[in-house]
C-alpha cells in the first residue's frame, strides 16, 4: 500500500464499499456525536467523512485535541452511509471511512483565518496568509478554473494554426501609456532594462520575421494604481498577432475563441456571433462610456436641438454657451412616487451635477418638473427620439459635453439598478470601433495618442496631410478596437501601422523627433524598412475573463498570489529594502525625498 494514499478524498463512492483505503489530507471539520467522532478530511480533490468509533476512545481523545488544518494520513474501510445521513452536498456523500489507524504528518498552529468558510477574514490577513486562503473552496476552485481556461485558450489558438512564442521579459522602456518597472543593469552602470508593459514590439517584429500567426500567454508589467478590475504590477493576457489581416479578420478569430470559452465554463447566455459593432462616438453618446454594459437596455439620447426650441430659457442659455442636453429614459416609471425622482436628483447632485430634470409620460398626461416648457409637438419629438411610450419617464442632464456624458452614464446605470432591469445571467459582448487616433490632454493642452501609438490611422498619411487644425487631428479615426463584455474592457487591439513614413508622421504630431522615434523604436523602424506585412492583433485579459466567469468583485480573487491595492505583496514582504552591497554592485545610491525636492 502507498505510504500516503491509495485514493484521493474526492473519489470514493459506493463502488469502493468494502475496500481498505489509505487517505491523506487536512483536518477540515470535526463533530462529536457522543461515542462517534466524525472528521471531514479535505484534499485538493474533495472531502470525505471519517468515522472514529467508540471502541477507540483513546484515539478519539487524541484526535479531538488536534487543531484544524493538521495534515493526517488515515487507514480504514469504506462503508455506505445510512439513508438519513447521506450528504448530497459533496461528491463522496454516499460513503464514509471507518478509521482503523492514523498518523499525523504535520501539526498546524492556531489559524489566523478560518478555512471552512464560516466567516471571511479581512483582506490584509487573507493576503498575508495566502497559502491558507488558497485552501478555501471558492478561491481554490477559481485557481483551478484559471488553469482550465488558459488551457482552453491555448488549445483554441493551436487549433487555429497559431504558434506559441515566449518574448523577452527584460527589454527596453517604451511609452505605452503607463509607468515602466525598471531593472538596473549591473554590467552597464546607469542603464536600465524595463519589464514589458506588453510584448507589443516583439509580436510585431515576429510578423516581420515571416511568421503568420503568433500567440502567447503573456505576463505584462505596469506600474499603475490598482482598481477592482486591475492588479497593480502584473497581469496576464492572451496576446495575439496575425499577418495580412483586416480588422474583420481579427474579429472573426477572437469571437469564437471567447464565445467557446465562456460557453464551456459558464451556463449564462452569451451574445451570438457576430458580436455587435458600436463606434466609439455612438458608444459615448448612447452609453456615456467606451465600455458599454449592454445588460442594461437603457440608451442615452442627445436632445439638445429639441431643448433649443423649447421655452426653457435657463437651459437654452446654457446651450448657447456650449452645453448639451442628454436624455436618459426610465422605462415604466412614470407613476413612481415622488421619492424615486427626488432620489435620482440627489444622486445627480452627488455626482457634481447642478440638478436633474424629468418628464413623466403618464396615462393621464404629461407631468414632471419641466413639462410646462414644451408644447405637444416638442414632447412628441422627445418621445420619438428617446423611444419612450406612455408609462415611461425621462431624466435630463444639461452640462458641458464631457461632464454631461459622465453624469448621464452614471444616471443610466443608477436607473437600471433602481428599476432592476439589468440582466445578471448573461454575457453581453460588443466591439467598440473607430477610436480617435489622437486626444487632447487638457492638463498640458497637448495632442497625445488616445490608444496604441502603433495603430494604423484610417485614411493613412493622407489623413495627416489633410489635417489643418487641432480639430482635424482629433477627428482622425484609427483602426483600433476594444472587445467589451458586461461593461468590462477585455482587450484593446488594432491593425498596426507598418509604414516608416507614417510612423514618423504620427509621432511628430505628438512632439517626437525622428531621432527620438529611432532611439525608442529603432528595432521596429528598421524592420519596417525591409518589407513589413500588414498585420494586426489583440490581447484579451485573462484575469478579467476569469473575473467575469467567477462573478468575482475584484481581480485578486482570480490570482493565486496578488498584491494589495498599495502594490504590496504582504506574503513575501515586498517591495523590500536591499543591502548596501547590492546597491554598490549596481552602482546605485539612495537619496532622500527631501533632496529630490
Swiss-Prot record:
Residues 200-203 are annotated as: Aspartate. GO terms for biological process: aspartyl-tRNA aminoacylation. SUPFAM superfamilies: Class II aaRS and biotin synthetases, GAD domain-like, Nucleic acid-binding proteins. Its EC number is 6.1.1.23. Pfam families: GAD (PF02938), tRNA-synt_2 (PF00152), tRNA_anti-codon (PF01336). L-aspartate binds at residues 176, 222, 451, 496. Its main location: cytoplasm. InterPro entries: Aa-tRNA-synt_II, aa-tRNA-synth_II, aa-tRNA-synth_II/BPL/LPL, Asp-tRNA-ligase_1, Asp-tRNA-ligase_1_N, Asp/Asn-tRNA-synth_IIb, AspRS_core, GAD-like_sf. Homodimer. NCBIfam families: aspS_bact, PRK00476.1. Aspartyl-tRNA synthetase with relaxed tRNA specificity since it is able to aspartylate not only its cognate tRNA(Asp) but also tRNA(Asn). Reaction proceeds in two steps: L-aspartate is first activated by ATP to form Asp-AMP and then transferred to the acceptor end of tRNA(Asp/Asn). Belongs to the class-II aminoacyl-tRNA synthetase family. Type 1 subfamily. This is Aspartate--tRNA(Asp/Asn) ligase. It comes from Orientia tsutsugamushi (strain Boryong) (Rickettsia tsutsugamushi).
